[in-house]
């Protein structure tokens, strides 16, 4: 069936939907927070806390993660006005989390760290802790994506959207990271 002249004049062009596309939720929330809406920041926290938690879990002792998550979001709240592009909130807060993890290690070099293995007596917790330690020993490029996938339960596209990595990079990092993790688990278990 062909379109008539009347249909063409009264119908909405196919590209019009693209032009009127609403901004992403984080853009709306960042703008709302900058205008004084504190509930908007609570929603940003709910959206991005798993990302920050996963980044930290890949880099710092588990006992420190919750405090650092709170510290990072407090810092982000105070510095939100410096964010140039509201759509970049995810990569921006991910960068803050990575930097805070580096800062944590700088500060903790002079202090004695509590061994995570001493806190959990359950066999399941012990095995999970061993695997987490193996993940932490992987190259940084794989560590973060594996923790976000395996611990935080994010999908590949979610990891890409929240970290600023491309979907292809996430897939490659997950594939290579899992391959290395399997090799290390096999070596650890004598397979």
What would you call each of these model-derived segments?
Residues 78-85, 95-116, 124:
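Arg/Lys-rich amphipathic alpha helix in sigma70-family domain 2
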Residues 67, 81-95, 167:
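Short, aromatic/basic-enriched loop-to-helix "N-cap" motif that marks the start
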Residues 18-19, 34-42, 53-71, 162, ...:
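Short, charged helix-capping/linker segments at alpha-helix termini
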């Amino acid at each position: 069936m062909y379109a008539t002249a009347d249909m063409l004049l009264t119908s909405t062009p196919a590209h019009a939907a693209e032009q009127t596309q609403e901004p992403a939720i984080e853009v709306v929330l960042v703008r709302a927070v900058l205008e004084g809406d504190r509930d908007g920041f609570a929603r940003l926290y709910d959206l991005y806390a798993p990302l920050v938690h996963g980044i930290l879990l890949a880099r710092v002792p588990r006992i420190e993660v919750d405090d650092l998550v709170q510290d990072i979001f407090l810092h982000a709240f105070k510095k939100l006005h410096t964010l140039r592009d509201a759509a970049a909130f995810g990569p921006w807060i991910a960068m803050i989390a990575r930097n805070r993890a580096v800062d944590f290690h700088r500060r903790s070099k002079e202090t004695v760290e509590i061994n995570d293995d001493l806190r959990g007596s359950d066999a399941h917790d012990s095995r999970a802790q061993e695997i987490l330690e193996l993940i932490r020993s992987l190259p940084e490029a794989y560590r973060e994506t594996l923790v976000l996938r395996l611990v935080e339960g994010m999908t590949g596209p979610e990891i890409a959207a929240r970290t600023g990595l491309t979907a292809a990079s996430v897939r490659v990092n997950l594939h290579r990271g899992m391959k290395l993790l399997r090799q290390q688990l096999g070596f650890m278990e004598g397979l």
